Amino acid sequence: METAMGVNSGSSLEDRPVALVTGGARRVGASLCRALSASGYRVVIHCNRSHAEARGLQDELGGAEYAAVLAADLAKGGAGRLVCSAEKVFGRLDGIVNNASTYRRKSLLAISDSELREDLEVNFLAPFQMMREFARRGKPGWIVNLLDGRIAKDDVECAGYLLAKKSLAEATRLCALDWAPLGIRVNAVAPGFVLPVEGASEDALARLVERLPLRRRTPVEELAQAVLFLANTSSVTGTILYLDSGMHLQKSDTGEKSTRL
């Protein structure tokens, strides 16, 4: 397991860096929180409705000295305020993992205006607002955005989701260039199939994985390692790491109905 830069086993709590993970209470987000905590970070766990899971994870990570919980509905605005609140918890904020997302499989003609707004709000606008608020502090730090291997393709059946993720990919590069003089690094990870979408079976996911060039799903442990690498490597910015078993190399739609969340 990588260790946060400047942190060793004898460091005091005040010396430990702090990371905010959106959608951190469950599934992939919870795994990222565990990995960051194990590498020396104190973690601010953001949740929307998963309050019990977030509190349970907080206890698992060592209690209030090592982890905190903040609740917010990113579809209703206020993402910038979440950054300010996270910094106040431990008196510092060193990095953000934009993991929270919504997913619906609807085409451009089928998706309603309200559904499109929600997709854009949660998957693009909220992460961007958080990044911008983080940069406005004028302090060095890092940001890792969770994307999707399909940003390199055109899957017209999940239009709102993909429009938002493609926008976040472009924002990753633009913000990395713009904020480099501030010492802020902005990177992203684009995973393939990590977990079945809730309600879907492992068999359904396995059939999708068989269509990928490497024919393997993305282990959540590898995803966590990639996030830690981008968080702790000071010379990397504006990079998108594809952990998708080659999905981004395929130009045709493979009929995916499962995502990492």
List PLM regions with ranges.
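Conserved glycine-rich cofactor-binding loop
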Residues: A25-R26
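Conserved NAD(P)H cofactor-binding loop of Rossmann-fold oxidoreductase domains
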Residues: N99-R105, G246
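Substrate-binding pocket helix/loop in short-chain dehydrogenase/reductase
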Residues: S107-L108, S112-L120, L208
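C-terminal substrate-recognition "lid" of short-chain dehydrogenase/reductases
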Residues: V220-L243, H248-L249
